[in-house]
C-alpha cells in the first residue's frame, strides 16, 4: 500500500495528491485508505520512509556491485539519479514542509546512521581505511542528492569527477580497480 501511495505522491506532488487520489491509485473506495492508515500525516511519513529506502537501496546496490569499476559505478549512479529524481523531489517536499519537516527528521537520522556501515563496506572492498574513503562517500552522496533535486549536471559532474579520481587512486594503490 505504501508503495502505491508513494508512486501517487511522486506523480502528483505532495500538496496536490489528495486522499481521493491515493484511494483511486490503490483501487479503494473513497476513504478506504484510512483502513490502512489513521491520518494523511501517517501516509506521508510512511511514504517518505519508503522514498528513503528506494533511493538508499538503489544507490548502495550499485555501489557495492560496481565498486571495483569506479567509472562504471559512477555512470550507473548518474543513471539512477536521473530515474530517482522525482522520488527525491517528493522527499525534499516532505522535508521542507512546515507540516511534516520536523516529523521526518528521525527517518533522515536513521539513514545518516547507516552511512558508516556503507563507508566500511566500500573501504573493505577497496582495501583502504574508512577514514580514507569517508570524505568521498559523503561527497558522492551530496553530489547525487543535489543532482536528483536540481537535475543539473553542472552541480554533479565536477564533484563526481573528483570522487572518481580519488576512489580510483585509492583502489589502484591497493590493486583493486578494474579501470
Question: How should these model regions be labeled?
Answer:
Residues 47-73:
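Amphipathic alpha-helical linker/stalk segments
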Residues 93, 128-151, 158-169:
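Hydrophobic alpha-helical segments that form the core
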Residues 2, 44, 48, 52, ...:
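Amphipathic, non-transmembrane alpha-helical scaffold segments
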Residues 4, 8-42, 46:
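Helix-turn-helix
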Residues 56, 60-61, 83-86, 100-127, ...:
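Amphipathic alpha-helical packing segments from all-alpha helical-bundle domains
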Residues 4-11, 58, 62, 90, ...:
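Solvent-exposed, amphipathic alpha-helical segments
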Residues 1-6, 78:
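A short, Lys/Arg-enriched amphipathic alpha-helix from helix-turn-helix/homeodomain DNA-binding modules
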Residues 70-96, 101-105:
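Helical hydrophobic small-molecule/effector-binding pocket
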Amino acid at each position: 500500500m505504501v508503495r502505491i501511495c508513494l508512486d501517487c505522491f511522486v506523480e502528483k506532488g505532495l500538496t496536490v495528491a489528495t486522499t481521493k487520489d491515493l484511494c483511486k491509485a490503490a483501487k479503494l473506495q473513497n476513504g478506504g485508505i484510512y483502513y490502512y492508515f489513521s491520518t494523511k500525516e501517517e501516509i506521508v511519513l510512511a511514504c517518505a520512509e519508503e522514498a528513503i529506502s528506494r533511493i538508499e537501496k538503489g544507490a548502495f546496490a550499485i555501489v557495492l556491485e560496481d565498486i571495483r569499476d569506479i567509472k562504471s559505478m559512477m555512470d550507473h549512479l548518474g543513471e539512477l539519479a536521473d530515474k530517482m529524481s522525482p522520488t527525491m523531489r517528493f522527499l525534499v517536499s516532505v522535508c521542507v514542509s512546515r507540516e511534516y519537516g520536523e516529523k521526518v527528521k528521525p527517518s533522515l537520522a536513521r539513514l545518516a546512521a547507516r552511512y558508516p556501515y556503507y563507508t566500511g563496506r566500500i573501504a573493505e572492498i577497496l582495501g583502504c581505511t574508512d577514514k580514507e574513503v569517508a570524505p568521498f562517500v559523503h561527497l558522492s552522496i551530496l553530489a547525487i542528492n543535489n543532482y536528483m533535486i536540481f537535475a543539473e549536471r553542472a552541480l554533479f559532474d565536477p564533484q563526481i569527477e573528483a570522487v572518481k579520481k580519488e576512489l580510483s587512486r585509492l583502489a589502484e594503490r591497493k590493486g583493486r580497480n578494474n579501470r
